[in-house]
């Protein structure tokens, strides 16, 4: 998912997206360990999506802190 699409989501939706991505990563790692993973590059994609979501969440936290000061 692109960062532009993620920025359009609300904070609650981002938290939900983060949870679903972490769950997907867990399942992919499990499939990798059992030798059932069809697309190993998907792990990399999911890890990067998790990083994107975390970055956007952090950007919003920093923006809120600046407004409060």
From Swiss-Prot:
It comes from the Bacteria. The keyword Ribosomal protein applies. One of its GO terms (biological process) is translation. Keywords: Ribonucleoprotein, Ribosomal protein. GO terms for cellular component: cytosolic large ribosomal subunit. GO terms for molecular function: structural constituent of ribosome. PROSITE patterns: RIBOSOMAL_L29 (PS00579). InterPro entries: Ribosomal_protein_uL29 (IPR050063), Ribosomal_uL29 (IPR001854), Ribosomal_uL29_CS (IPR018254), Ribosomal_uL29_sf (IPR036049). HAMAP family: Ribosomal_uL29 (MF_00374). NCBIfam families: L29. Belongs to the universal ribosomal protein uL29 family. PANTHER family: 60S RIBOSOMAL PROTEIN L35/50S RIBOSOMAL PROTEIN L29 (PTHR10916), LARGE RIBOSOMAL SUBUNIT PROTEIN UL29C (PTHR10916:SF0). This is Large ribosomal subunit protein uL29. The lineage of its organism: Bacteria, Bacillati, Bacillota, Clostridia, Thermoanaerobacterales.
């Amino acid at each position: 998912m692109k960062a532009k699409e993620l920025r359009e989501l609300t904070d609650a939706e981002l938290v939900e997206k983060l949870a679903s991505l972490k769950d997907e990563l867990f399942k992919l790692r499990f499939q990798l360990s059992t030798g059932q993973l069809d697309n190993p590059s998907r792990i990399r994609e999911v890890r990067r999506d998790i990083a994107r979501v975390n970055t956007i969440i952090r950007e919003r936290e920093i923006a809120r802190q600046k407004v409060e000061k």
